[in-house]
Amino acid sequence: MSLQAPKGTKDLLPTESYKWQYLENKFRNIAADFGCREIRTPVFEYTELFQRGVGETTDVVQKEMYTFEDKAGRSITLKPEGTSPAVRAFVEGRLFNETQPTKMYYFTPVMRYENVQKGRLRQHHQFGIEIFGAKDASVDAEVISIPVGIYKELGVEGVELNINSIGCPKCRKTYNEALKKYLSKNYDKLCSTCKTRFDKNPLRILDCKVDTCKEIVKDAPIILDYICDECKDHFESLKSYLDVLDIKYKVDPFIVRGLDYYSKTVFEFIIDDITICAGGRYDYLIEEIGGPSMPAVGFGMGIERLLLTLQEKAIEIPEEAYVDLYLGNMGDKAKLEVLKLAKELRDRHIKCEIDHMGKSVKAQMKYANRIGAKYSMVLGEEELNTGKVSLKRMEDGKQIEVDIKEIDTLIKVFK
């Protein structure tokens, strides 16, 4: 029996990788426009990082993490999200001693044991941005504007931005009391997980995916009615900044996000009732992980989910030709010359492909056409004797005669 990729994973084949490269290049350029620099963190971390950062009572920690003991008996977890590792690296690298804010972006695989379905894999990839050291709501608005710009540049329409504030630990305590009072009336109907959350972290019940719990929380108290004046001012400022940036939004008081580290601002980008990007502020996570008290805000965007959206919206990603020139040959002597010419061109960053299979000239030209080469030429005995060769533009068949030895002249055709 042939081996297959594990359930919930997907190979990225060369026929699809150009789409990822296109998006990654676009994301890098946009991140650079905002002054962000790249960070790369390990694919696995100590489990405690996610227990402390993401939260013991979250679905991610309780149900979805890939956790194991290494040979030394240490508990290790494959990265289920990108923010906690970025914060850990920020603290461990003592970047808090540098001039703030610190702006980072990353591409990372994340692993969660979830039910596999359309657009949801057990290993998927995220593009994320994290900004440390700035507490003003203008930073929240700036972070939110990045996905807005991405969707606009890609031509994705129909994306809705939902925002909320879940307050700070001080005002959340008051809200939790009101929420527990409301939930106590239907305590017996809560799922077993939410019964555990009732005392430990009732806010998590608002994020439960079980139908009975979703029905119960429909009429729950709204957290915006309980946030303190400071959090209220921050949220009002955020809305003002979004208005100035002409970013349309809707306030959804039931967004809480599935991770415990969030405070104040939380947001989601929705299309066709599916979340395609989400984030928020996490002003207490850096201190929780061992750093100083320092504000932070960021987001994560699933790349597979974005690609699926582009496909559903019939938005095509342009495929660049990966071969500039196909160099055909007839005979061993010509093959030697082709090898030498290909090396000279590759040294000048011209993408070349040559025949290694001993194909006929007709088969070589078919291959050149199939791989999408921009140009082709064939060297044989006559071309070697005259030093001249016909360079064919594959798009329309137009040919020009070039001198084999005039590399600079040949280069100009491709530049």
UniProtKB/Swiss-Prot annotation:
Alphabetical list of HAMAP family matching this protein: His_tRNA_synth (MF_00127)
Organism: Clostridium botulinum (strain Okra / Type B1)
Keyword Transferase found: no
Reactions catalysed: tRNA(His) + L-histidine + ATP = L-histidyl-tRNA(His) + AMP + diphosphate + H(+)
Organismal lineage: Bacteria, Bacillati, Bacillota, Clostridia, Eubacteriales
Keywords of the record: Aminoacyl-tRNA synthetase, ATP-binding, Cytoplasm, Ligase, Nucleotide-binding, Protein biosynthesis
SUPFAM superfamilies in UniProt: Class II aaRS ABD-related, Class II aaRS and biotin synthetases
InterPro entries the UniProt entry points to: aa-tRNA-synth_II, aa-tRNA-synth_II/BPL/LPL, Anticodon-bd, Anticodon-bd_dom_sf, His-tRNA-ligase, HisRS-like_core, HisRS/HisZ, HisRS_anticodon
Keyword Aminoacyl-tRNA synthetase: yes
Entries under NCBIfam families matching the protein: hisS
GO cellular component, one term: cytoplasm
Gene assigned in the entry: hisS
Name of the protein in its database record: Histidine--tRNA ligase
EC annotation from Swiss-Prot or TrEMBL: 6.1.1.21
GO BP terms: histidyl-tRNA aminoacylation
Family as reported in the entry's similarity comment: Belongs to the class-II aminoacyl-tRNA synthetase family.
Enzyme class: ligase
PANTHER family xref list: HISTIDINE--TRNA LIGASE, MITOCHONDRIAL-RELATED, HISTIDYL-TRNA SYNTHETASE
